[in-house]
Amino acid sequence: MEALIKEKLHEIEQRENCRILLAVESGSRAWGFASPDSDYDVRFIYVRPRESYLRLNRVRDVIELPIKGVLDINGWDVDKTLKLLHKSNPTVFEWFSSPIVYQTTDFTEAFKPVMRRYFSSKSGLWHYLQMAEGNYREYLRGDMVKAKKYFYVLRPILACRWILEKGTPPPMLFSELAASQLPDYLEKTVAKLLDLKMNSPEVKMIPRIDILNAYMDRSIAEVRALVEQYPREITKDWEELNALFLAALEM
């Protein structure tokens, strides 16, 4: 599959007249809890020729391929990426910390130290809190629930707790988050659920796990109360991001 993904990325570069600066796996495979039939969620950052950024009718700043089978591939222009980094968009931090990398360049190494300086704890907390709340409300209220949905609530909750404790971007791998933030009394329950999730189809239904639901209810309420008290953060300047953009145009 990796060879096919790299072939698709090369086709994108040829067809779109762009250069891919970074291509990674996102989603459950990068989080470390993929099911046997999980999609490959490939995400990439690209740059076009300088002239493309000097047009009155600007080219669209995303490239999206139709989903085919288990392949889901799309990417962002470096221009869009840097603007989102200025807002401390957590997705940017996730892509650049993915443990599964399909393609990279010198831009990635230049980007990472700058990226860390633009991290906002408050923005990260709101992002992961809203993700946890939405998935919990939508998928885990019934008597029977999809096993995989527990991890789409647990991971953002643990990410919030990581940010509250450390003030840094949370790691992609669920195992690293769990080792740091999951309460001891839930370890066996979550380990059993993780084994089930990774060895069952994506649609596997199980009875609701009340001990996990209680933890999620309590955690969501606690995080919301704390993030609402966070002070307004100072807006970062654009200087370093402008320099990165110009450097990307030369690659």
Predicted regions and their residues:
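Short loop/turn segments at secondary-structure transitions that flank enzyme active sites
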Residues: 48-51, 88-91, 134, 159-160
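Conserved NTP-donor binding/palm subdomain of two-metal-ion nucleotidyltransferases/polymerases, i.e.
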Residues: 8, 18, 77, 83, ...
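Conserved nucleotidyltransferase catalytic core and NTase-mimicking acidic/glycine-rich helix/loop elements
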Residues: 112-237
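A basic- and aromatic-enriched beta-loop-alpha substructure that forms the phosphate/nucleotide-
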Residues: 55-131
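Catalytic metal-binding acidic patch
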Residues: 27-67
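Acidic, carboxylate-rich catalytic segments that either coordinate divalent cations
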Residues: 231-251
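Helical scaffold of the NTase/Pol beta-like nucleotidyltransferase catalytic core
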Residues: 1-24
